[in-house]
Amino acid sequence: MCVPRPDSPSVFGSLLDRSAGHFRLSPHDRTVPAARRYLPGGLVLETTWQTDTGWMIVRDALVMAPWYDVEERSTTHRRTPSDWESEHMLLRTVRCVNGTVDLYVSCEPAFDYHRGRTEWSYTGKVYEEATAVCRNAPDEHPTLRMTTDLRLGIEDREVRARRRLHKGDTAFVALSWSDCPMPHTFDEAAVKMAATQDYWREWITTGRFPDHPWRTYLQSSALTLKGLTYSPTGALLAASTTSLPETPGGRRNWDYRYAWVRDSTFALWGLYTLGFDREADDFFSFILDVSRDADGMRYPLQVMYGVGGERELPESTLAHLSGYDGATPVRIGNDAYHQQQHDIWGTLLDSVYLHVKSRGHFPQTLLHTLRRQVEEAAANWRKPDRGIWEVRGEPQHFVSSKVMCWVALDRGAKLAELQGRPDYARKWAAIAEEIKADVLEHGVDERGVFTQRYGHPSLDASALLIPLLRFLPADDPRVRATVLAIADELTEDGLVLRYRVETTDDGLAGKEGSFTICSFWLVSALVEIGEVERAAALCQRLLDYASPLKLYAEEIDTETGRHLGNFPQAFTHLALINAVVHVIRAEREIGAGNFRPAHLGP
């Protein structure tokens, strides 16, 4: 857990090293629970524990509540504040539901990725309140406050508590890094827990979800995306973790606690489709914020940003941490922020186009930003780059990057037409046609299949976006050939790889699992070419791979079903929404007699 921001240094990091901080609340003699779930309609986690003598239920939540400090303006909010805010508090409640259970609590923060020294002290005259600070840098890290109805014992860097619970007994522990009022009784804790669940249920009710067996997966993905949103700015984190390995014990370990511009198109499409217009608008506003000039300086559009809009995200390693299951290095920061990736202009322009179509108007303030990004794409599309997968090998002429530059010019031309600027529209449309012709000449093999890069026959899953981005119509034989080639040749046990590591210079050693987002892209692409039954079967299989909490990491090991990489991953959940909606709409059109596979023509 990282506080006060999701990209701040961790205080509980046992996921990456058992000595890097923990907060355990469980039966004294158990480490594996009997069951775990989110309460329906929200992000309140419920864990059921069974012992030889009884059962108990633990509920965990990051507390949401109406605005607390109404007389002082927030210094972090750039988006319009809602009626609710986070109380910056982790609340844990316990209820024994059968027999007796010996409850055990252990909280040992390890500030600054276990580089700081923790010092606990009692607050006041009672055992039920304590405070933890980073002793060697107290002003640089938040103070942690704990309240509970258990008696706490301080043992060096750790506080502990224990109690024998009988059927009907309750307990709570709250940990805060803010000045919001904390609970001092179980009843007060229960009120906060109930209010938090009410908040989530009210929020999810504002969405639009089809009456379908897959509805719960859409709702879970929507909740996950909301949970990954940094509300003060609207930024959407790629994931909430760093350095969970893409290969067990391997070195493909990255920090994903940042916002990628690339996520914007799928984020807006998914959020608008499900009815979460406010969240879509907030993320769109964040993307516009970071793409504009600042402090009189003109900054180029970057691949990624900090959740507060920070431009510099220098990468370093934490050699003192052993890594998840021994996988090193543990990285913080991400050097991809200064890579040249030419798809970013297309994703930004596609986002603007989606926003304008959804909202029905084109804000005049967008025109300058729009023109800059279109001109950047026009000036750079002929150059090699690092590509959508942020390879750390040599820059290449990646087909997906050229396609996204086409998107930038195509959407720019359409938007210019809407703005009454036919001069720009004609100019940009002509360049878009030039890019398309170049891709069709150099990026398609003799089979009529789109390749990964110019001059090489390797396949790449990013080509599945070609029909989704309308680079070519879905009934074009090259689109169908590409989708089927990827489905047949770039899969392991039916799940899609992003590319073959043995034919792609990504600057790294080792294998990786199938990329779940790519498998969901295949679902959408199969629907586009009329293979609805095949798409539905693959979609159901992918949904079956979901974790017990309906969450997805970046990759799946096809041999074991194990999730690999950072978790949960926003891009995967965005692709899930796109795929599920594609299948549901196609099946309903077939049922109504309106669906015609693209390859059959009009």
Positions of predicted regions on the chain:
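Acidic, mature catalytic/reactive cores of soluble proteins
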Residues: 1-602
